[in-house]
Each structure stands twice: as C-alpha cells, then as structure tokens.
C-alpha cells in the first residue's frame, strides 16, 4: 500500500489505527527507523484501554535524548499502519517531550518484517 506524506515537512507522518479493550483510535505517528520499537503516548494508550496508572507493566531500558529510562511495555489489540496490521502488538508507553510535532513513533519493531520504501521525490511511503 502506498501512502502520501509531505516530503517538505521533514517528518514522515501517516495515519495508523490502534485498537484496545476500550475502542479504536486513529493516530498520526512519525516513521522512525532509528527507533527500535514503536512508542505511543500513555494518554493515547489510556484512551483505547491499554494502559492504566497504578498497574505494574514489564519495562525495557530505552536510550532517549535525556538519558536511559525504564519504559513500560504494553500490548495493543491491533496496530494497523501503511496497509499492514499486527495483532497483540507490544509497544512502549512513553510520552515524548512537549514541543515535538508528534507524540508517537512507528519503529523497527513494526516495520522490520516488511519492505519499506520512502520516496521523498514523490512524497509516498510504501510498506509491503
């Protein structure tokens, strides 16, 4: 599937559908080939019923711009992006710093199993 993006904007943004016990939400993550895993904000994960304060989740140590942090690992029922769908998909629950143009990242954990083409001349991204 081919999805258009704005090649002048700098970030490759596209729609992604997330499902959890409380419902479905369409988000707009940034494609991040430097991110090992997909990261979603805790607010978004709460919205679809996949994250709750006070519950202990497995964590992973993640290197961020401000150092190494322990990030909860949370399972979403379904993540669909760029025409591909993964069920029972583990993501990182972490709110990115304010001021960024996005609060979610689609990382290598999702795209690694596919062929990825990002064409900045035409403004299309393909995941097959």
Question: How should these model regions be labeled?
Answer:
Residues 1-128:
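Pepsin/retropepsin-fold aspartyl endopeptidases
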């Amino acid at each position: 599937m081919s999805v258009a993006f704005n090649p002048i904007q700098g970030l490759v943004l596209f729609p992604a559908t997330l499902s959890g016990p409380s419902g479905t939400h369409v988000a707009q993550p940034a494609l991040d080939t430097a991110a090992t895993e997909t990261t979603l904000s805790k607010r978004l994960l709460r919205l679809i019923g996949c994250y709750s304060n006070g519950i202990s989740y497995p964590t992973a140590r993640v290197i961020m711009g401000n150092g190494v942090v322990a990030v909860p690992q949370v399972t979403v029922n379904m993540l669909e992006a760029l025409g591909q769908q993964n069920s029972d998909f583990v993501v990182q629950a972490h709110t990115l710093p304010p001021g960024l143009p996005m609060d979610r990242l689609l990382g290598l954990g999702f795209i690694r199993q596919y062929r990825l083409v990002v064409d900045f001349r035409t403004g299309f991204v393909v995941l097959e």
